[in-house]
């Protein structure tokens, strides 16, 4: 009993008898408010605990031979699909001018609604080809005229594109498609006129080498001439080229939680005709490791935009269109998901309860003793 009596001396929470306790309305109000505050802060701490923590790390990118996937969804409200070509090239010298897969063009009306029920697949760098004649009716061994543009290695022009290519090799302007039988047969002029007031949506993805390069959207047929990439714009009027565009989505690789693509939802209006828009993109290779161990290899990027007026078809002034020029950072970012510490959560909850309880006690004491002091003064005033 002696030891128990000594132990009681260490009690930091002495109790008072029920008869000596005073309960007030002010104390009840403080208790209710402090309880609600504790409840709100508890759920806030719980929500914070349940969210995953991201730990960033920085490494030198040692990956080699990988491909870079470029996801594209861009709308050109004033550029018909028949006029638009998309090309990709890199510093290693690889060019993609005739890609058939993974990229689509959708014709749009003035309200940006699809003209057809489904998107047509196109080759990058080529205009649409709607065959309006029966190919079986033509001799497969035929050799049609190139209208004076024949060469030793290019003597037959059986399609409108063949004639355009022959003219291009000669350096001639392709201005009179209606006088060329192949183009008349394929309805080249009708197709161009039919889409004159339409827009175009380009969507899909490209796979390129993981080196610096660019891809661009520009009017006219693209080709190489003396190791220079050019577009045939001689059949277009520069005053008719409106490169207003809306980038609905542009990313380099797979999405991961929290990824922000800075160009998504951006819209740029061309204030003049024949504008050249350049997007300079810095790509940072990124590895995202989920809590379950799944690894996502992707990229994040930053971008700056530059625009200028072009006055020439070919030359130092540039080409009208939208150009995305990208380069890769030598550093790699690794983002690792981890669960938050339960002990940290427990510490936070204890701090919330103890802190609110202590502050509430101080407020209650202040209110109680202030009220008593005022009441005593009032009573003394009445007595005198």
Curated annotation (Swiss-Prot):
Q: What is its main location?
A: endoplasmic reticulum
- Spans through the membrane: 26-46, 343-363
Return the InterPro entries for the record. Answer: Erv, Erv_C, Erv_N
Q: Which GO terms describe its biological process?
A: intracellular transport; vesicle-mediated transport
The chain's Lumenal topological domains, given as residue ranges, are: 47-342
Q: Does the keyword Endoplasmic reticulum apply?
A: yes
Write out the coiled-coil annotation as residue ranges: none
Does the UniProt entry include the keyword Phosphoprotein? no
Task: Output the Gene Ontology cellular-component terms.
Answer: endoplasmic reticulum membrane; endoplasmic reticulum-Golgi intermediate compartment membrane; Golgi apparatus
For this UniProt record, the keywords arranged alphabetically read as follows:
Endoplasmic reticulum, ER-Golgi transport, Golgi apparatus, Membrane, Transmembrane, Transmembrane helix, Transport
Topology of this chain in the membrane: Multi-pass membrane protein
Q: State one Pfam family annotation.
A: COPIIcoated_ERV
Protein family:
Belongs to the ERGIC family.
**Purpose:** Possible role in transport between endoplasmic reticulum and Golgi.
This chain belongs to the protein called Endoplasmic reticulum-Golgi intermediate compartment protein 3
Q: Which organism was this protein described from?
A: Xenopus tropicalis
Q: What is the lineage of its organism?
A: Eukaryota, Metazoa, Chordata, Craniata, Vertebrata
Could you tell me the gene encoding this protein?
A: ergic3
